């Protein structure tokens, strides 16, 4: 069984993707990185292909159309399940999620079924405003209730 898969979705993340991949690989963990790109017109997938020559742990799925974050995450989850990864961690490609927390999540998961990071807990950073803030805040409360999490 493969152990760790890091998943991210991209659309026009050319300026961030190399930084993200380097930060993840600098953790020196045995992991794979799957990136679902929605045919970014800025050259994101071309940059990922270049990075694949440097890092053998990168998996790129380039979709023909922009079909959104939710379907990208579904694809990542299906890939993880099909390829029997033990752990899956999703990060935003825009660097709003700190890859250094991957080690914290992996340490915590040993005692739980699920670990969920949130910008609303102590130490979290929230820069959302207006409707995005409300949707995110209440969406997280609903997820916590469904998962019966603390």
Language-model regions, residue ranges each:
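Short, acidic, metal-binding catalytic loop of nucleotide-sugar glycosyltransferases
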Residues: 22-31
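Acidic helix N-cap motif at the loop->helix transition within catalytic regions
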Residues: 15-19, 42-51
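Acceptor/aglycone-binding surface of glycosyltransferases and processive sugar-polymer synthases
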Residues: 61-82, 87, 99-150
């Amino acid at each position: 069984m493969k152990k760790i898969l890091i998943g991210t979705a991209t659309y026009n993340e050319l300026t961030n993707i190399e930084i993200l991949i380097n930060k993840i690989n600098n953790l020196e963990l045995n992991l794979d990185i799957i990136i679902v790109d929605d045919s970014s017109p800025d050259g994101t997938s071309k940059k990922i292909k270049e990075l694949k020559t440097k890092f053998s742990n990168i998996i790129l799925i380039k979709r023909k159309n922009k079909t959104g974050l939710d379907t990208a995450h579904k694809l990542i989850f299906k890939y993880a399940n099909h390829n029997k990864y033990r752990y899956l961690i999703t990060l935003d490609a825009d660097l709003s999620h700190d890859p250094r927390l991957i080690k914290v999540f992996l340490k915590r998961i040993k005692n739980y079924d699920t670990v969920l990071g949130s910008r609303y807990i102590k130490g979290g950073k929230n820069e959302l405003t207006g409707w995005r803030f409300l949707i995110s805040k209440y969406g997280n409360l609903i997820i916590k209730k469904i998962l019966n999490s603390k």
